[in-house]
Every structure is written in structure tokens, then in C-alpha cells.
Amino acid sequence: ASGADTCCSNPACQVQHSDLC
């Protein structure tokens, strides 16, 4: 999903959702 892709580009979101990346 594009939302997960955007989260993958955000370091803060990546930390909170490391399982998505």
C-alpha cells in the first residue's frame, strides 16, 4: 500500500512501524 511506502520513507514512522518496511 502507498501508506506503508510513505511510512517507509519516514524514519519516525519506520521506527513505529518497522514491521511494515
Curated annotation (Swiss-Prot):
The keyword Lipoprotein does not apply. GO terms for molecular function: acetylcholine receptor inhibitor activity; toxin activity. Expressed by the venom duct. Residues 9-11 are annotated as: Ser-Xaa-Pro motif, crucial for potent interaction with nAChR. InterPro entries: Conotoxin_a-typ. Its main location: secreted. It is found in: Secreted. GO terms for cellular component: extracellular region; host cell postsynaptic membrane. Disulfide bonds join C7-C13, C8-C21. Keywords: Acetylcholine receptor inhibiting toxin, Amidation, Disulfide bond, Neurotoxin, Postsynaptic neurotoxin, Secreted, Toxin. Alpha-conotoxins bind to the nicotinic acetylcholine receptors (nAChR) and inhibit them. This toxin selectively inhibits alpha-3-beta-2/CHRNA3-CHRNB2 (IC(50)=3.51 uM) and alpha-6/alpha-3-beta-2-beta-3 (CHRNA6/CHRNA3-CHRNB2-CHRNB3) (IC(50)=0.94 uM) nAChRs. The cysteine framework is I (CC-C-C). Alpha4/7 pattern. The 6 amino-acid N-terminal tail displays a well-defined structure and plays a role in stabilizing the peptide. Negative results: does not inhibit rat alpha-7/CHRNA7, alpha-4-beta-2/CHRNA4-CHRNB2, alpha-4-beta-4/CHRNA4-CHRNB4, alpha-3-beta-4/CHRNA3-CHRNB4, alpha-2-beta-2/CHRNA2-CHRNB2, alpha-2-beta-4/CHRNA2-CHRNB4, and alpha-1-beta-1-gamma-delta/CHRNA1-CHRNB1-CHRNG-CHRND acetylcholine receptors, as well as on human alpha-9-alpha-10/CHRNA9-CHRNA10 subtype. Belongs to the conotoxin A superfamily. This is Alpha-conotoxin CIC. It comes from Conus catus (Cat cone).
